[in-house]
Structure formats: structure tokens, C-alpha cells
């Protein structure tokens, strides 16, 4: 698509199937891609902590003031990069919430101080929430990796939900689906 002068009649879609560009060098004006993947979860726990309280394993984050934190049930066991510890972020109710402490195997915590957040609230790990958006390319860069690795590392514990025109048209849950 970038090289019309070639005599080949096929192209390797690769990462473009996710609506992501294979490299920064690609002319993005020549081919407009729209991200085809969003990653969502939900809040499972909300807790107030005191100043001086450590968060997560190793307490690599220590609260410098009283804070409210929310627990998100996603971790490196799902393919979410541990390298986002203390530097990644999510969106809850359209607002950016920073990851506090280490990303664990099955969960991580975020700062929701001053927000009206409750258990069950939708969490956007990648995608749009209101006027805000988290791009997989940005998360991959924060994690010190690239978009291919980010999307390929998402494991079978993460259910797939296929949406077309705002409606769910299919699902794949490797733990809930029946196999014969």
C-alpha cells in the first residue's frame, strides 16, 4: 500500500488489522488507520489510604497524602505490561487515573482521589472514554516495547468481544465457552 510501484498483488496486513501502523516511518497521510481494538475492565475495589501507606508489592509507591485508590482486575498474567508499574494510566469516567505501585499478576491499583468512583465502574485500558483516549502505541512506548508486542501479549484470560456498529456481534471467552 505504501509502495504502489511494486509488482506484487498482495500485501501483509499484520498489525494494520488492529488499525495500528507498523512503524513510525510510515506515511500516515497516505493510509489512514483507525484503531480496531479497545481494552476494558472494571473497578473491583475502592479504598482510602493514609499518607505514608505503600501500595502493591514492594511498596514502590508510597502515598504523600491521604488518597483513594481503585483496584483493577487485570495484570501481567493477562498480558498487561508490568513495565507500566508507576507510570501507566487508565481512564475511569473519562478521567485519567495513574497506576500506583506495581502491576501484579492479576491486578493493579490506580489513583482515583477526588473522583466519584465505585465498584463496577468501567475502566478503559486502551481506547476512548468521553473525549479522552489511550492509544496502544502510547502505552507500548511507556512500557518500553512496541505495538506488536502489546497486542500479541494479551492472553487467553482476556475475553474477546466483537462489536460492529455499536452492537456485539460475537464473543470468545476461552474460560467460559464450551469446547467439544
Annotate each language-model stretch with its function.
Residues 1-180:
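Active-site anion/phosphate-binding pocket segments in diverse small-molecule metabolic enzymes
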Amino acid at each position: 500500500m505504501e509502495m504502489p510501484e511494486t509488482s506484487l498483488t498482495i500485501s501483509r496486513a499484520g498489525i494494520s488489522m488492529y488499525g495500528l501502523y507498523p512503524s513510525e516511518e510510515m506515511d500516515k497521510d497516505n493510509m489512514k488507520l483507525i484503531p480496531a481494538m479497545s481494552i476494558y475492565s472494571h473497578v473491583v475495589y475502592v479504598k482510602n489510604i493514609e499518607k505514608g501507606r505503600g501500595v502493591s508489592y514492594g511498596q514502590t509507591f508510597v502515598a504523600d497524602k491521604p488518597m483513594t485508590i481503585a483496584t483493577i482486575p487485570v495484570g501481567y498474567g493477562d498480558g498487561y505490561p508490568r513495565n507500566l508499574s508507576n507510570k501507566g494510566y487508565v481512564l475511569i469516567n473519562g478521567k485519567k487515573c495513574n497506576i500506583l505501585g506495581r502491576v501484579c499478576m492479576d491486578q493493579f491499583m490506580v489513583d482515583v482521589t477526588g473522583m466519584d468512583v465505585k465498584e463496577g465502574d468501567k475502566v478503559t485500558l486502551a481506547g476512548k472514554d468521553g473525549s479522552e483516549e489511550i492509544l496502544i502505541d502510547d502505552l507500548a512506548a511507556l512500557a518500553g516495547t512496541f505495538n506488536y508486542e502489546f497486542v500479541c501479549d494479551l492472553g487467553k484470560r482476556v475475553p474477546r468481544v466483537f462489536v460492529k456498529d455499536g452492537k456485539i456481534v460475537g464473543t470468545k471467552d476461552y474460560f467460559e465457552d464450551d469446547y467439544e
